[in-house]
Amino acid sequence: ITQLRDGELAQIRNRHFGFIFQSYNLFPELTALENVMVPLMYAGRPRRERRERAEALLAQVGMAHRLKHLPTQLSGGEQQRVAIARALANNPTLLLADEPTGNLATDQGAEIMTLLQELNQQGTTVVIVTHDPAVSAYGRRLLRLRDGKIVSDGPLQEAALEA
């Protein structure tokens, strides 16, 4: 992998990785629908397929009614859900999520965590960084860090007992 060119690395990231950023990183000049379509465009998917996939993902995260809204017209929780839909656009094999429910209401957070659990059961590796014990309870394995070092690592039940 160290021998790959930047373009090749970008292709791997686009096709195999999904990123849910705590700060969303949505394009401010693009609508919710267009933001979710971006990774599909870079993957070379036809426009109609991009639109259909983006609409389906936005519906899945409860945002079908806000397709044409810009990020500035969305609440923090709505922006978070658009960012989650975008991260799932290319069916990543590895999903990296930084506080994916941090800006969501409790019920919406539970729905998103259930969705991430289902993706994991279907074969997607999901890595979540969180300070929220309720979110970590959805996991199968828990790594605890302190001062940048792993202080415990194991199945969720064992790691919870070590806390």
Please report, for each region that a protein language model flagged, where it lies by residue.
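Conserved beta-strand-loop-alpha-helix hinge in the C-terminal portion
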Residues: 149-163
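ABC family nucleotide-binding domain
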Residues: 1-145
